[in-house]
Design a protein with these regions (language model features):
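Conserved NTPase motor "head" modules and their coupling/switch loops across ABC/AAA+ ATPases, GTPases
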Residues: 3-112, 121-125, 129-141, 148-155, ...
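Walker B catalytic acidic pair
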Residues: 116-118
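H-loop (His-switch) and adjacent beta-strand-loop-beta switch element
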Residues: 158-172
Length: 173
């Protein structure tokens, strides 16, 4: 189980590298697991049996590959400790684009890419570069709080391929 996960993680890291190269060769993002020892199948079964009552009570499984801890590195430094808000946002978006590409390659299906408040915390240069990267991704849904901000990044609301849905909140005093 961990071996399969390791192979998928390596494939995903390669996809992240490709996306980063398309975005900008100066940026590298790497994901590494911080789980010290990978148990054998027998170790896992033993721990599952040992924790079964706790798992049932908590309604979740406490052991397994889904509990591995990961560290995201941005320019070879742990993002959590050293990354600015813009670097966090940029890393998140690049990881989502890589995830989209990875799923597309693994399943031969083109998933919808959903990016919430895409341009927040990104300067115009980074925002435009991200938009250029996702432009050919297929169906993409981008939420944003400001239509002007979207236009500043090269998204034309009058393009028939784009659909802008403007939501208004009805304020009552």
């Amino acid at each position: 189980m961990w071996l399969e996960k390791k192979h998928l993680q390596q494939s995903f890291n390669r996809e992240v590298l490709l996306v980063c190269e398309k975005y900008n060769n100066d940026i590298n993002i790497n994901i590494s697991t911080t789980t010290p020892k990978k148990p054998t199948e027998n170790d896992l079964l033993e721990k599952l049996e040992l924790n079964i009552q706790k798992d049932v009570f908590l309604r979740r499984t406490l052991v397994g590959p889904h509990t591995d801890k990961y560290t995201v590195f941005f320019k070879d430094k742990p993002l959590r400790e050293y990354g600015s808000q813009g670097e966090h946002k940029l890393s998140f978006v690049l990881l989502k684009v890589a995830e989209h590409s990875f799923i597309k390659k693994e399943t031969n299906k083109n998933p919808t890419l959903l990016l919430d408040d895409l341009f927040a915390k990104l300067d115009n240069g980074r925002g435009n570069a991200i938009f250029d990267l996702i432009r050919k991704s297929g169906q993409t849904i981008i939420t944003n709080t400001d239509l002007v901000g979207v236009e500043a990044h090269g998204i034309n609301p009058n393009n028939p391929n784009n659909k802008i849905i403007h939501l208004l909140r009805n304020w009552k005093n």
